[in-house]
UniProtKB/Swiss-Prot annotation:
The keyword Transcription does not apply. The keyword Acetylation does not apply. This is Protein GrpE. SUPFAM superfamilies: Coiled-coil domain of nucleotide exchange factor GrpE, Head domain of nucleotide exchange factor GrpE. Belongs to the GrpE family. The lineage of its organism: Bacteria, Fusobacteriati, Fusobacteriota, Fusobacteriia, Fusobacteriales. It comes from Fusobacterium nucleatum subsp. polymorphum. Residues 21-37 have a biased composition (Basic and acidic residues). Its main location: cytoplasm. Residues 21-52 are annotated as: Disordered.
Length: 202
């Protein structure tokens, strides 16, 4: 081989070597760039993700606090409502008899006036009439409130009558009521005082 050919061959090898080194350097740079790009992108996404999570947590905490405050307000309102209703019930219990007492006051006034008048005039017939009128007024008041007298004719009934004694009487049948010692009353279907009676026993 000639010297010229040898020189050209050596030159070609050197050129190829330099070209290969350049190519390798470019590949290393590209790989490094891709790695940095990926790593950088991952870091960026991580920071963005943390920021997003913090915002969501903050919103949830705010909502929980709002719900808590709303619950406390509702609880306070309910407690106030309960106390108010309890007070109203206490007032109703305290003054439940006010209406009926007010109605009886008129009859009491009439009775006192009738007594005073009879003492001055000695007219006891007028006193009797006055008392009878007062009794009628009282019965009217009771009737308006749903109070009625328990019937005592016929057979003894333990639901409505309270037997305090027995009596053998030919004019009555067995277990019939012979005598009424105290009248009984019902209020709107409920026995508020049974009639006190004597029952016939043969």
């Amino acid at each position: 081989m000639k010297d010229k050919d040898i020189k050209e061959e050596v030159l070609k090898e050197e050129i190829n070597k330099e070209v290969n080194e350049e190519l390798k350097n470019e590949e290393v740079k590209e790989e490094t760039h891709e790695h940095e790009h990926k790593h950088g992108g991952h870091t960026c996404c991580g920071k963005h993700g943390h920021k997003h999570n913090d915002e969501e947590i903050g919103k949830l905490k705010a909502e929980i606090e709002e719900w808590k405050n709303e619950y406390l307000r509702k609880q306070a309102d309910f407690q106030n409502f309960t106390k108010r209703k309890e007070k109203e019930v206490d007032e109703l219990k305290k003054f439940a008899s006010e209406k009926i007492i007010t109605q009886f006051l008129g009859s009491l006034d009439n009775l006192e006036r009738a007594i005073e008048s009879s003492i001055e005039s000695k007219d006891f017939d007028s006193l009797l009439k006055g008392i009878e009128m007062i009794v009628r007024n009282l019965k009217d008041i009771m009737s308006a409130e749903g109070v009625e007298e328990i019937k005592t004719e016929g057979v003894y009934d333990p639901v409505y009558h309270h037997a305090v004694g027995v009596e053998a009487n030919e004019d009555f049948k067995e277990d019939e009521i012979v005598k009424v010692l105290q009248k009984g009353y019902m209020m709107k279907g409920k026995v508020i005082r049974p009639a006190m009676v004597i029952v016939c026993k043969k």
